[in-house]
Structures are given as C-alpha cells and as structure tokens.
Amino acid sequence: MADNMTTTQIEVGPGGTNATINFEAGILECYERLSWQRALDYPGQDRLNRLKRKLESRIKTHNKSEPESKRMSLEERKAIGVKMMKVLLFMNPSAGIEGFEPYSIKNSSTSNCPNCNWTDYPPTPGKCLDDIEEEPENVDDPTEIVLRDMNNKDARQKIKEEVNTQKEGKFRLTIKRDIRNVLSLRVLVNGTFLKHPNGYKSLSTLHRLNAYDQSGRLVAKLVATDDLTVEDEEDGHRILNSLFERFDEGHSKPIRAAETAVGVLSQFGQEHRLSPEEGDN
C-alpha cells in the first residue's frame, strides 16, 4: 500500500435522500411534459421510463423507513421537486420549501443577487467527519469472518454461510483475508438486513463502511449520517458481493482501499464523492 495513501472520507448529510428523490421527481415531471408535447426522441423516452421505474422503487423503499405522516407519493414529490428547481434556477430563497433552504451568506458585491452569495452546502453542524468515531457502532453479537489459509472456493462458501445465517436488523461484519502471507484490506461494515418470508435476505441500508490497510491504518471511510438506502432488494446482495469478490480474487498484493470504496459507492451512484486522486490510488 502506498505510503502517501490518504483517508477517503465520505459523508452524506441529513435530508439528502429526501432532497434527491424529490429533485429527481421534478426532473421526471419535466420529462413527462416534454413527452406530452411529443418533444422526446426514443433515447429520451427510454430515460423517462427508466427514471420513473427507479423512482417508484426508491420511494417505496424509502417510505418504509419514514413515519406514516412523512410518507409521500410520487405525485407529491413531483410538486416539491418542481419548486426545488425554481429555488435553484432563480436563486430565490422566498420560493423555498420546508426542508430545503439553500445556504447563503451576505455579500453586497455579488452582482446577480446583491444580498446573497450562493455557495456549496456547508458540513452538517456537529457532524464533521473528524468528530465521528472511527469504529462502526457496537451491535449485539458481531460477526467476524477470518479467511486464513483458505482457497477462494472455500472462502466464498464461508462468507456465504456466515452472511446467510446472520439475523435481520443492524449487524457488524468484519472480514479478514490472508492472501499468500499478505494480510489484505480489513473491512468493517454496519448495515441493516431485511429477512423475507422465503428466507431471502437483502441489505436495505448501509450505515458505515471502514477499510484498513495491512498496518491497521484507516484508509477508507464511508459514513452515512443520512442512511444510504438500497433501491431494490437485489442491490443488497450485489453490494456485498462486490466487496467479497475483492477478497476472493487471490491477488498477491494488498487490495486497494480506494478501489473498494469506489466499488461500494458505485452501487449507489455516488462515485463522485471520491476525488480522482483518491480513486486512482
């Protein structure tokens, strides 16, 4: 592992999930209006259909984690999303909506908006990454899988058995893997699993992922201060499988932490949270 490897830190701020879903619902509304005007080509119509299916699935999953009073339909979210667009496009805080207020600071020199200087969202107060403990939270009966002196086939089978017997709810999973006498990346995962009547188990939420190099130094950290919610059941297994595959490839060199972080984030469409430098390490 390169000595200049820096810790990859990713934070998802509170309210981000709702804001993203609502905004995408507003985009869907725009697509549908274009379709009504027969202004969409075939690729555009395909994107409309895929976005609608994705949003319907994501809203259904997200509503399960919300109190009944806060659950919203796709149509309700479309209306909020359109208002959000007005706020963003016209920089008008008076058009703001509850739960979505653009951050601004006084700056009389700004020509387009004499009272505001529009900036990126600041870090969530009290939730800076440096203030968050490094280790994932404690959970009852944590699962640790040690894969030493095992071939890839046996390692995969052991992981599958351990995960499939894990009870539903929050859990902590530690995976250690020795490959050709080199201790590979150590990954700690906090997540919430749902167990279905047919015995199928799916990852519904990923709360935290820490990755450490062979010296025990933290090199990648995914912190979900607002949970990253998996959009459909199949995603849960794909996310974990993408992790496990990195331990089962049998590389002689230690697995790269940044690559693992990219692999996990890509399942949520969050690759942009890694800088190019971090992604290349």
Curated annotation (Swiss-Prot):
GO terms for biological process: symbiont-mediated suppression of host ISG15-protein conjugation; symbiont-mediated suppression of host PKR/eIFalpha signaling; symbiont-mediated suppression of host type I interferon-mediated signaling pathway. SUPFAM superfamilies: S15/NS1 RNA-binding domain (SSF47060). Residues 1-103 are annotated as: G1P2-binding. InterPro entries: NS1, uS15_NS1_RNA-bd_sf. Residues 1-93 are annotated as: RNA-binding and homodimerization. GO terms for molecular function: protein serine/threonine kinase inhibitor activity; RNA binding. A motif (Nuclear localization signal) lies at residues 50-55. One of its GO terms (cellular component) is host cell nucleus. The keyword RNA-binding applies. Keywords: Host cytoplasm, Host nucleus, Host-virus interaction, Inhibition of host innate immune response by virus, Inhibition of host interferon signaling pathway by virus, Inhibition of host ISG15 by virus, Inhibition of host PKR by virus, Interferon antiviral system evasion, RNA-binding, Viral immunoevasion. It is found in: Host cytoplasm; Host nucleus. HAMAP family: INFV_NS1 (MF_04066). Homodimer. Interacts with and inhibits human G1P2 conjugation by UBE1L. Belongs to the influenza B viruses NS1 family. Binds and inhibits the conjugation of the ubiquitin-like G1P2/ISG15 protein to its target proteins. Since G1P2/ISG15 is an early antiviral protein, NS1 may inhibit the host antiviral response. Prevents EIF2AK2/PKR activation, either by binding double strand RNA or by interacting directly with EIF2AK2/PKR. Also binds poly(A) and U6 snRNA. This is Non-structural protein 1. It comes from Influenza B virus (strain B/RU/1969). The lineage of its organism: Viruses, Riboviria, Orthornavirae, Negarnaviricota, Polyploviricotina. The gene is NS.
